[in-house]
Amino acid sequence: MDIEKAGSRREEEEPIVQRPKLDKGKGKAHVFAPPMNYNRIMDKHKQEKMSPAGWKRGVAIFDFVLRLIAAITAMAAAAKMATTEETLPFFTQFLQFQADYTDLPTMSSFVIVNSIVGGYLTLSLPFSIVCILRPLAVPPRLFLILCDTVMMGLTLMAASASAAIVYLAHNGNSSSNWLPVCQQFGDFCQGTSGAVVASFIAATLLMFLVILSAFALKRTT
């Protein structure tokens, strides 16, 4: 009797563990997340790339690079013309044959104009950076296109006038009895020709800057 009572007490003290019942053939369907629409994500990414702020920022970066190259080219043209001179090895008691840019007012104007253009392009770099940071801002872009147009005209004027003088120095003018001097002053003519070519390159870059600014100011529909 004692053994039976002890066994019944153990049965009462042990917790009863109920196993979950499995419904055979009646399992619940698993819930899956809907598949991601990759086409929609790619379309959204393309729209962000083709947004006005996106392509205008790219134009502003290209503008900054061209502006930096144009500034270096204009200052190089002014420095080359200002440092070009040549003195012939023979001279007389009263004459010394020397060629310098200060002998011709056109060459002096060339140095002044290209120095101004190079300084302007250097000072305009912060405005170009503003256009990169704020590609939709209109006032800095409008300021740049106006100033670039003026500087392009000045550069073309100085380069064209100096090119005419360099042409006369190389070929002369028989109707005006102007003799070519580049046979005697070869180094001087070579230096001035290089400066004129650099100035025309700077003018071409300024023209591209004007086109870029006009393209950036274009309104998108």
Swiss-Prot record:
Topology: which residues are Cytoplasmic? 1-58, 131-148, 216-221
Presence of the UniProt keyword DNA-binding in the record: no
Report whether Cell wall biogenesis/degradation shows up as a keyword of the record: yes
What does a knockout show? Disorganised deposition of Casparian strips.
User: What is the top-level taxon of the source organism?
Assistant: Eukaryota
Report the locations given in the UniProt record. Answer: Cell membrane
Membrane topology label: Multi-pass membrane protein
GO terms for CC?
Casparian strip; plasma membrane
State the Gene Ontology BP annotations. Answer: cell wall modification; cell-cell junction assembly; positive regulation of amyloid-beta formation; proteolysis; regulation of protein stability
Q: Which cysteines are joined by disulfide bonds?
A: none
Bilayer-crossing regions: 59-79, 110-130, 149-169, 195-215
Stretches of the chain found on the membrane's Extracellular side: 80-109, 170-194
Q: Where is the composition biased (Basic and acidic residues)?
A: 1-12
Q: Which UniProt keywords apply?
A: Cell membrane, Cell wall biogenesis/degradation, Glycoprotein, Membrane, Transmembrane, Transmembrane helix
Q: Which Pfam families match?
A: CASP_dom
| Residues bearing carbohydrate | 173
Positions of the region Disordered? 1-27
Gene Ontology MF terms: protein homodimerization activity
UniProt cross-references to InterPro entries, sorted A to Z? CASP/CASPL, CASP_dom, CASPL
- Provide the family line: Belongs to the Casparian strip membrane proteins (CASP) family.
**NCBIfam families named in the record:** A_tha_TIGR01569
> What is said about its interaction partners and assembly?
Homodimer and heterodimers with other CASP proteins. Interacts with CASP1, CASP2, CASP4 and CASP5.
Its biological purpose is as follows: Regulates membrane-cell wall junctions and localized cell wall deposition. Required for establishment of the Casparian strip membrane domain (CSD) and the subsequent formation of Casparian strips, a cell wall modification of the root endodermis that determines an apoplastic barrier between the intraorganismal apoplasm and the extraorganismal apoplasm and prevents lateral diffusion.
Task: List the protein's name.
Answer: Casparian strip membrane protein 3
Q: Which organism is it from?
A: Arabidopsis thaliana (Mouse-ear cress)
